[in-house]
């Protein structure tokens, strides 16, 4: 970070860094964005304010002795007995929560070939962890790709701006047609395999997740990990993964211009694909997850779209359609 700041200043950018500076309020005015802090700083109005808050820390009062609304609401410091532990979410945050519980009841051991095993403590035989999400799908491992990103050939700034200028009606569908052409250009074989030409904004996400939904999530994670590690060794980029990663940053520019109907369609479809792609997680997290599976400790439950969560004093109960 400091190196980047230094490089920016060398190129005549004015960069100010305020450490331990808490933003207490934001006010949007006709002149710009006014920011209030807990430090005695000169009042300043900004043309653009980027809010990068990171994790949202829930109200500590929501946490109980048996319920933690996030890994950062006391779970990391709590003593969790060897019991039936349910974790909402299969993203990296959910896996972090699982690891925080697991290391209280054993240890991870890695051999020379990067294979990880989990050694459970003798007194922790009753430990059982269930990861729960609507789909039960696990994130994939970080994949190899060139950085800085290579430019897109079809979904360019000029092409997107031209579509935006045509108006919000049909904007999402027009841009999706550009996306299809970009993906076909990058990876014609994969495009043919998923029948890309037959898909639309609403069905693309279904095709993206279809094969993973049919497979055991742990088996898929193991296969994906092997592929990712092989690609890293060989400096091989998977074209369709890489083009989706680059498309995400480009396509997000149209989101403020979508009408309400298309905004909902985008959130249900393309947004989920983009999130799944860029939210890939470190290989080490996958290895530890698989180690817990091999130890018979961790399981995954797909909740479906309709479920209820009842938080009681002694336990939390989830009710699903089944």
What is each of the regions a protein language model found here?
Residues 1-322:
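Flavin (primarily FAD) cofactor-binding/catalytic cores of flavoenzymes
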């Amino acid at each position: 970070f400091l190196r980047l700041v230094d490089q920016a200043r060398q190129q005549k950018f004015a960069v100010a860094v305020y450490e331990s500076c808490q933003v207490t309020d934001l006010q949007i005015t006709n002149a710009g964005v006014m920011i209030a802090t807990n430090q005695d700083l000169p009042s300043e109005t900004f043309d653009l304010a980027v809010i990068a808050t990171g994790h949202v820390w829930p109200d500590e009062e929501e946490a109980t002795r048996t319920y933690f609304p996030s890994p950062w609401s006391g779970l990391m410091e709590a003593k969790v007995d060897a019991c039936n532990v349910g974790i909402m979410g299969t993203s990296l945050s959910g896996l972090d929560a699982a690891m925080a519980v697991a290391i209280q009841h054993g240890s991870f051991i890695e051999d020379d070939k990067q294979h990880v095993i989990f050694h459970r403590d003798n007194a922790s035989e009753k430990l059982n962890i269930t990861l729960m999400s609507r789909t039960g799908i696990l994130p994939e491992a970080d994949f190899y790709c060139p950085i800085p990103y290579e430019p897109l050939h079809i979904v360019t700034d000029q092409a997107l701006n031209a579509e935006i200028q045509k108006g919000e009606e049909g904007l999402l569908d027009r841009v999706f047609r550009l996306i299809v052409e970009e993906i076909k250009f990058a990876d014609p074989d994969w495009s043919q395999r998923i029948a890309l030409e037959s898909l639309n904004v609403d069905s693309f996400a279904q095709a993206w997740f279809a094969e993973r939904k049919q497979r055991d999530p742990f088996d898929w994670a193991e296969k994906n990990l092997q592929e990712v590690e092989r690609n890293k060794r060989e400096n091989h980029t998977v074209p369709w993964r890489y083009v989706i990663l680059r498309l995400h940053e480009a396509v997000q520019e149209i989101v403020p211009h979508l009408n309400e109907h298309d905004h909902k369609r985008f959130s249900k479809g393309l947004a989920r694909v983009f999130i799944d792609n860029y939210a890939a997680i470190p290989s080490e997290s996958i290895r530890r997850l698989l180690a817990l599976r091999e130890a018979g400790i961790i399981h995954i439950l797909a909740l479906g779209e309709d479920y209820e969560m009842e938080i009681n004093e002694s336990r939390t109960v989830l009710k699903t359609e089944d």
